[in-house]
Curated annotation (Swiss-Prot):
Known pathway: Purine metabolism; IMP biosynthesis via de novo pathway; 5-amino-1-(5-phospho-D-ribosyl)imidazole from N(2)-formyl-N(1)-(5-phospho-D-ribosyl)glycinamide: step 2/2
CDD domains cross-referenced by the UniProt entry: PurM
Gene: purM
Keyword annotations: ATP-binding, Cytoplasm, Ligase, Nucleotide-binding, Purine biosynthesis
Compartments, as annotated in UniProt: Cytoplasm
Protein name, UniProt field: Phosphoribosylformylglycinamidine cyclo-ligase
Enzyme class: ligase
Family according to the record: Belongs to the AIR synthase family.
Species of provenance: Pseudomonas aeruginosa (strain LESB58)
Top-rank lineage group of the source organism: Bacteria
Pfam families the record matches: AIRS, AIRS_C
GO BP field: 'de novo' IMP biosynthetic process; adenine biosynthetic process
Gene3D superfamilies found in the cross-reference section: PurM-like C-terminal domain, PurM-like, N-terminal domain
Catalysed reaction, written as an equation: 2-formamido-N(1)-(5-O-phospho-beta-D-ribosyl)acetamidine + ATP = 5-amino-1-(5-phospho-beta-D-ribosyl)imidazole + ADP + phosphate + H(+)
GO molecular function, one term: ATP binding
Length: 353
C-alpha cells in the first residue's frame, strides 16, 4: 500500500483561482461604464494609468482611503450587498471634494475567507454605481481570498481614491470668518458611521429590524440606505459661485468633531439643531438605546451629511445653486469668533432627553 502524499493544489488550500478570474470577467463591464477619457487601458494591468485632465495650470493631486466600518457586518447579517459599494465610494470621494477636488479614479480592496463570485460581483457593481455618481473611474482593485483569515464568505472592504484640484483654488477653511453662514445638505440616514453603536442598540432592543416600520419603510432599509455622494452638486456650487470657504463631510464624530477640522483657530460654529427635522431612524436609535443627546451628535450625523461655509452675503445664491442641482439645502448656523479654550461647535436647541 502506497503512503505517497497526495498532490495538493491551491484550491485544496482554499483559494480558487478560477473563481477570481470569473469575477474579473464579470466586473469588466462595470469598470468600463465608469471610464473617464484620461484613463489609459482597462482592467488587468499591473498598474492603472491616468492622465491629469486638461485645463489645469498647477494641478494638485488629493488622495484618500476609507472603509465602511461595521455597517458591513449588518450587510452580511441581512445578506444585502447591493449598496455597500456605493457606501465605500462615498466615504472616499466626499472626503476629497471638501477641499475642492474633482475625483479622478478609484480602486477597491475586497478580502474574504472564501470568494462568493455573485456577492463580490454585486458589491463591485455598487462600487461602479458610486463611481458613476461621483464622476470618477474604477481603474482597478484587489480581490484577496484568504482562508483562515475571515469566517467563511465574510468579507472586508477598503477604498482608495485620487482627485485633482487647481492649486490656487484649494478650499482649506483659511478664509472662514465671523458672520459666515453654514449651509447643510441632508444625509440619507446614518451613512457609514456609528454602526457599532447602532448594532449594540439593535441587540439591546431585541428588535427585528426587518419587521420594524418607520415612515412606512422597514428599519433595515433605513439603516442600509447608501451614503449620499455630494460630489457633483458641490463641484457645481464651487464652479458657479466661487463662494465656498470650507466644507466638512459629517462622518464618525458627527457635527461636533468634523466641523472643527476645517475651522481656523479663532472660529466657532454655532448650529441651530431646531433648523431641521431629524429623520425618524435617529429618534428610534436614541430612544431604544437611551442615548444622550450630545452623544448622538458626537457619533451620528443626525440627518446632516455635509456642511458648507460661505459668506452670509453669498448664502442665498449658494442655496439657489444647490437646489437647482437637486439638493435640499438649508442654513444650519453661523460662524462666530471664539477664544482659544472655547468649544469649537455649539449646538443650540438640543432636545431634552
Amino acid at each position: 500500500m502506497s503512503s505517497k502524499q497526495p498532490s495538493l493544489s491551491y484550491k485544496d488550500a482554499g483559494v480558487d483561482i478560477d473563481a477570481g478570474e470569473a469575477l474579473v470577467e464579470r466586473i469588466k463591464g462595470v469598470a468600463k461604464r465608469t471610464a473617464r477619457p484620461e484613463v489609459m487601458g482597462g482592467l488587468g494591468g499591473f498598474g492603472a494609468l491616468c492622465e491629469i485632465p486638461a485645463g489645469y495650470k498647477q494641478p494638485v493631486l488629493v488622495s484618500g482611503t476609507d472603509g465602511v466600518g461595521t455597517k458591513l457586518r449588518l450587510a452580511l447579517n441581512l445578506n444585502k450587498h447591493d449598496s455597500i459599494g456605493q457606501d465605500l465610494v462615498a466615504m472616499c470621494v466626499n472626503d476629497l471634494v471638501v477641499c475642492g477636488a474633482e475625483p479622478l479614479f478609484f480602486l477597491d480592496y475586497y478580502a474574504t475567507g472564501k470568494l462568493n463570485v455573485d456577492v463580490a460581483a454585486t458589491v463591485v457593481t455598487g462600487i461602479g454605481a458610486g463611481c458613476e455618481l461621483a464622476g470618477c473611474s474604477l481603474v482597478g482593485g484587489e480581490t484577496a481570498e484568504m482562508p483562515g483569515m475571515y469566517e467563511g464568505e465574510d468579507y472586508d472592504l477598503a477604498g482608495f481614491c485620487v482627485g485633482v484640484v487647481e492649486k490656487a483654488e484649494i478650499i482649506d477653511g483659511s478664509r472662514v470668518q465671523a458672520g459666515d453662514a453654514l449651509i447643510a445638505l441632508p444625509s440619507s440616514g446614518p451613512h457609514s458611521n456609528g454602526y457599532s453603536l447602532i448594532r449594540k442598540i439593535i441587540e439591546v432592543s431585541g428588535a427585528d429590524i426587518e419587521q420594524v416600520q418607520l415612515d412606512g419603510k422597514p428599519l433595515a432599509d433605513l439603516l442600509m440606505a447608501p451614503t449620499r455622494i455630494y460630489v457633483k452638486p458641490l463641484l457645481q456650487l464651487i464652479k458657479q459661485t466661487g463662494a465656498v470657504k470650507a466644507m466638512a463631510h459629517i462622518t464618525g464624530g458627527g457635527l461636533l468633531d468634523n466641523i472643527p477640522r476645517v475651522l481656523p483657530d479663532n472660529a466657532q460654529a454655532v448650529i441651530d439643531v431646531a433648523s431641521w427635522n431629524r429623520p425618524a431612524v435617529f429618534d428610534w436609535l436614541q430612544e431604544q438605546g437611551n442615548v444622550d443627546e450630545t452623544e448622538m451628535h458626537r457619533v451620528l450625523n443626525c440627518g446632516v451629511g455635509m456642511v458648507i461655509c460661505v459668506a452670509q452675503s453669498d448664502a442665498e445664491k449658494a442655496l439657489e445653486v444647490l437646489r437647482a442641482a437637486g439638493e435640499q439645502p438649508w442654513q444650519i448656523g453661523r460662524i462666530e469668533t471664539c477664544g482659544a479654550d472655547a468649544e469649537r461647535v455649539v449646538l443650540n436647541n438640543l432636545k431634552n432627553h
